[in-house]
């Protein structure tokens, strides 16, 4: 019996499968009276190259990839007709996306309708404050609660020092240090995993996400990769996004390890992740201060007195430039696509008119 079949069997045995799938009033409010007649509410639980796997109250449904389908991702809610054909995609409560890997600027959807995101960073050579800031910008843009999970605490001699460095990014950040192989340690994360709640793990390859998923599930569902001791980089062990049902009733979305994650249209997320830097900028003498050599620059003053790290400020500027460039390029591509679509429709319309005139 495969994992997705077990998922649906467990779901059907509950008294309220839709609630356990993460159905909320937000989605209920989007329904019309017609939607209650001979329709099926389904959630995307896996996305593979061949199509989407959906979970419903009655079991699982497979939708083949087709040009008429909107771009969907794991966690999305959709409406199907009685023949299990796609009707429409419901508005999302939250959406995570990034620039697709590679040189081409294209948006890749990661997960939708998530309540809490566990940002996983291992306490070994992978520990990287700038990467954590990047993930925080992504999570804040989606307006989702972030929880920093510092993994492999058993392999680190200075856990408190590294945790303190992360806490300095934001005094209100929730941070948990865990050993993925210790059940008592990973149980700290269960308070976010109650019935109806959807959580997701994001992090780079080799940080121990699959080990944490196994710990929360209480079984060996995800394969785990060995770590090369010389550089602490793990093999990719999760290659597609999928949903798991947790013992406490919550929904867990696991994502592939991402060595590259570039931001697109993420200005608000960057602003929130670097709220301290922007608060300093409000006190600069000039409203258009570039925070370089201008007199009365509060940002440079904070760098000089040590209250703001040069690294953090440089990363703030880097992420702002990155999201602006990728966003502008993507907007241009969308505009060109719309123009091409309009041109195609006009050509087809003219062709039909000529055929009708004969």
Curated annotation (Swiss-Prot):
Zn(2+) binds at residues 284, 289, 291, 297. GO terms for cellular component: cytoplasm. Keywords: Cytoplasm, GTP-binding, Hydrolase, Metal-binding, Nucleotide-binding, Ribosome biogenesis, RNA-binding, rRNA-binding, Zinc. GO terms for molecular function: GTP binding; GTPase activity; metal ion binding; rRNA binding. CDD domains: YjeQ_EngC. GTP binds at residues 151-154, 203-211. InterPro entries: G_CP_dom (IPR030378), P-loop_NTPase (IPR027417), Ribosome_biogen_GTPase_RsgA (IPR004881), RsgA_GTPase_dom (IPR010914). Residues 106-261 form the CP-type G domain. Coiled coil: none annotated. Its EC number is 3.6.1.-. The keyword Nucleotide-binding applies. Binds 1 zinc ion per subunit. It is found in: Cytoplasm. It comes from the Bacteria. It holds the Pfam family RsgA_GTPase. GO terms for biological process: ribosomal small subunit biogenesis. Monomer. Associates with 30S ribosomal subunit, binds 16S rRNA. One of several proteins that assist in the late maturation steps of the functional core of the 30S ribosomal subunit. Helps release RbfA from mature subunits. May play a role in the assembly of ribosomal proteins into the subunit. Circularly permuted GTPase that catalyzes slow GTP hydrolysis, GTPase activity is stimulated by the 30S ribosomal subunit. This is Small ribosomal subunit biogenesis GTPase RsgA 2. It comes from Vibrio parahaemolyticus serotype O3:K6 (strain RIMD 2210633).
């Amino acid at each position: 019996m495969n994992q997705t079949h077990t998922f649906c069997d467990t779901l059907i045995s509950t008294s309220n499968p839709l609630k356990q799938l993460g159905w909320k009033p937000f989605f209920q409010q989007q329904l019309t009276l017609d939607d209650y007649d001979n329709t099926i509410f389904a959630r995307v639980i896996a996305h593979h190259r061949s199509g989407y796997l959906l979970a419903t109250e009655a079991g699982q449904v497979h939708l083949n990839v087709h040009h008429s389908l909107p771009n969907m991702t794991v966690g999305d809610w959709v409406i199907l007709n009685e023949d299990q054909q796609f009707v429409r995609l419901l508005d999302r409560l939250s959406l995570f996306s990034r620039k697709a890997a590679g040189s081409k600027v294209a948006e890749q959807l990661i997960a939708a309708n998530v309540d809490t995101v566990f940002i996983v960073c291992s306490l070994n050579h992978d520990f990287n404050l700038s990467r954590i800031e990047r993930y925080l910008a992504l999570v804040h843009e989606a307006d989702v609660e972030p929880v920093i999970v510092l993994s492999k605490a058993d392999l680190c001699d200075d856990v408190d020092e590294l945790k303190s460095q992360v806490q300095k990014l934001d005094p209100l950040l929730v941070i948990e240090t865990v050993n993925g192989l210790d059940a008592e340690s990973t149980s700290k994360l269960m308070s976010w995993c109650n019935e109806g709640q959807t959580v997701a793990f994001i992090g780079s390859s080799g940080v121990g996400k699959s080990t944490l998923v196994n710990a929360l599930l209480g079984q060996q569902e995800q394969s785990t990769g060995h770590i090369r001791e010389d550089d602490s980089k793990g093999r990719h062990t999760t290659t597609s996004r999928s949903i798991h049902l947790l013992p406490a009733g919550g929904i867990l979305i696991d994502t592939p390890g991402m060595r590259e994650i570039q931001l697109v249209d993420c200005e608000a997320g960057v602003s929130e992740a670097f709220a301290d830097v922007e608060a300093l900028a409000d006190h600069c003498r000039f409203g258009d201060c570039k925070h370089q050599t201008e007199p009365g620059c509060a940002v440079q003053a904070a760098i000089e007195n040590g209250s703001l790290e040069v690294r953090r400020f440089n990363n703030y500027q880097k992420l702002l430039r990155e999201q602006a460039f990728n966003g502008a390029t993507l907007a241009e591509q969308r505009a060109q696509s719309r123009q091409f679509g309009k041109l195609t429709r006009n050509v087809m319309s003219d062709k039909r008119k000529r055929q009708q005139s004969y």
